[in-house]
Amino acid sequence: MYSGNRSGDQGYWEDGAGAEGAAPAGTRSPAPLFSPTAYERLALLLGCLALLGVGGNLLVLLLYSKFPRLRTPTHLFLVNLSLGDLLVSLFGVTFTFASCLRNGWVWDAVGCAWDGFSGSLFGFVSITTLTVLAYERYIRVVHARVINFSWAWRAITYIWLYSLAWAGAPLLGWNRYILDIHGLGCTVDWRSKDANDSSFVLFLFLGCLVVPVGIIAHCYGHILYSVRMLRCVEDLQTIQVIKMLRYEKKVAKMCFLMAFVFLTCWMPYIVTRFLVVNGYGHLVTPTVSIVSYLFAKSSTVYNPVIYIFMNRKFRRSLLQLLCFRLLRCQRPAKNLPAAESEMHIRPIVMSQKDGDRPKKKVTFNSSSIIFIITSDESLSVEDSDRSSASKVDVIQVRPL
């Protein structure tokens, strides 16, 4: 996979990595596109991004494995996202980092294929996970449907299969992986006018950008509308319900912020590739290309920071990890297993309205916080689950 040949055809690189007639990556190595100082700075930036990405995402995985209270279906999606970001930090920038140290691409065609495949696969996993997470928020907040681990694991399996299909297509002949414009990594052939290659680029934009972004916007738009409507319902104005509504809003904000930050980091890369596809590749210089690449890879650093600062359970778990004995004495009941805490359902609000309106009992699950209002206080929760919609009205879900 390693090639020590540093001599090359400068004209090939001036036309761009995706120019027609370009030789496969590794058969011809380019002359340096940047100065030695620039390569050193790029290596330093990539090394810092990789270290921060590995450290932050490993911390998320450690917290999830150590603290049972974090083991919920929603957190499982966050862990899958962190796993994808961790793999990007470990494998997605390795060849580019080594090439920066050698002042240019030094790998053969197999190395180029692996670099393009790994970067594409883990990037697709991230955007698809954020899309599924938005849908999960949507069905739980808007439709008050509770998902379980079985649903979450199936969704994660489909996420990886879907991403693997898109990343593996160029290896099977639908488009190909070639050296990028900056000459330090590989990507799909954006410039090719061949019908086979251009059709892949078109469907890739639709399947991995337009559709996911559309689903994310639709889901969070409905979540925002539903939360505002629920806050206007007079019967829900109890202290506990108001707290839950605020909690739902915070969770939705956190998930939306993750999607927004991810798309913001990838937007320069998407714009530059869109210019190349539409015949404006001369505007995308190697410097512009590598800067957009660095912005895209920086997305792996931000998600762990968002978890810690916006998710109270992750924040408390981190503090408990750092000061275990002190917090264990202060909060002995906080580290109960998730399965144990979900077994008991208890009433939290009893409200009596004036007139002939029956007494209403609001119950909830102490882990997933499912509010159930029944018109008959003698009706048990088990009976409520089997009763018709006229007797039971599920009005809110707290998922984490």
Swiss-Prot record:
The keyword Metal-binding does not apply. It holds the Pfam family 7tm_1. The chain crosses the membrane at residues 39-63, 76-100, 116-135, 152-175, 200-227, 254-277, 286-310. Glycans are attached at N5, N196. GO terms for molecular function: 11-cis retinal binding; all-trans retinal binding; G protein-coupled receptor activity; photoreceptor activity. Gene3D superfamilies: Rhodopsin 7-helix transmembrane proteins (1.20.1070.10). One of its GO terms (cellular component) is cytoplasm. The keyword Phosphoprotein does not apply. It is a multi-pass membrane protein. Residues 1-38, 101-115, 176-199, 278-285 are extracellular. Disulfide bonds join C112-C186. Its main location: membrane. Interacts with MC1R; the interaction results in a decrease in MC1R-mediated cAMP signaling and ultimately a decrease in melanin production in melanocytes. G-protein coupled receptor which selectively activates G proteins via ultraviolet A (UVA) light-mediated activation in the skin. Binds both 11-cis retinal and all-trans retinal. Regulates melanogenesis in melanocytes via inhibition of alpha-MSH-induced MC1R-mediated cAMP signaling, modulation of calcium flux, regulation of CAMK2 phosphorylation, and subsequently phosphorylation of CREB, p38, ERK and MITF in response to blue light. Plays a role in melanocyte survival through regulation of intracellular calcium levels and subsequent BCL2/RAF1 signaling. This is Opsin-3. It comes from Mus musculus. The gene is Opn3.
